[in-house]
Amino acid sequence: MSDTLFPCGQLLSAGLFTDQSPFEKRVLMCKKSKRPQKRYFFITKRQSGKVGTNMQEVNLIVQSKGGCGKTFCCASYAQYVAARAANQVEVHCYDTDTSNRTLSRYKPLHVQVINILTRDNNVDIRNFDGLVEQFLEKDGIGIVDTGSNTFIPLMSYIAENNIAELLRESGVRLILHVPIEGGQAQVDCIESLGRILNDVDAEVVVWLNEFHGAVENAGKPFEQFGVYQKHKDRIIGIVRVEKRNPDTYGKDIEQMTKLHLTFDEVDATTEMTFMPKQRLRNVKRDIFAKLESLPVMANALNGGDDGK
């Protein structure tokens, strides 16, 4: 790992890159990015250098609206990152969803459950302290599934404790992944996205879940929404989960999530026949292809153009 890229956030002016430093600056521009003019700074370890003890990138999947495909997006992203980066850095997955611990049931992801409930089943937001400390103590990439019932206290915790700034100053890049579901839930999802962008100074990846309909307003696509136009400099990517036939693909995805199987486990299971497996391979191929365009650490580790 003598030539590995790591995100440096806003550390360019923090004196990190000195003659004595084990790090040197690079600039990443993903080859498949639709916004090639935007530059993302990373650091690369020199031959004699040693990566710091904190994580280099933390991904929080957040949305106040329940049932919008949040855990599916989180599980898909975790599988993608593990496939792309696990041989080069550690990938840490966490489940903080108090009402529906779904991600932790995906055994190959080795998910750690973060219990933020008291004995009376009330949310004790102080328990997030331990999670933040793990961000600062462990090396690699973090992926966190959060619950809709903890959205408000979590956003308050991040804002009140200046978590985004704390992580940035510690060399940890924070990325928020926000699923938006089309159909009846769209208005609530968009309002949640707006609050996230207003309250937290971090980069955002938007997932457009079209299972219940396209994400649009009066015929206008998401890219023309006011919330996107206002914050597009911080929205670093859009992942579109396309609507598919609910009688085939829909039921296949439902069965896969009900069994808590990863895409790789689907290929090995005896509980699905050939055609459902083939359709789920198509879903995996489509989602992974779209994730390749994101300017994230997993892609930087695998041949992203460093701009030199």
Residue ranges and their predicted role:
Residues 56-60, 86, 90-151:
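Nucleotide-state-sensitive switch-loop elements of NTP-binding domains
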Residues 21, 25-26, 32-33, 38-41, ...:
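Polybasic, lysine-rich low-complexity intrinsically disordered segments
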Residues 9, 15, 49-52:
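Residue-identity detector for glycine
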Residues 150-251:
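Conserved catalytic-core segment of NTP-binding enzymes
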Residues 56, 205-213, 220-308:
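P-loop NTP-binding site
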Residues 59-93:
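Walker A/P-loop phosphate-binding motif and the immediately C-terminal alpha-helix
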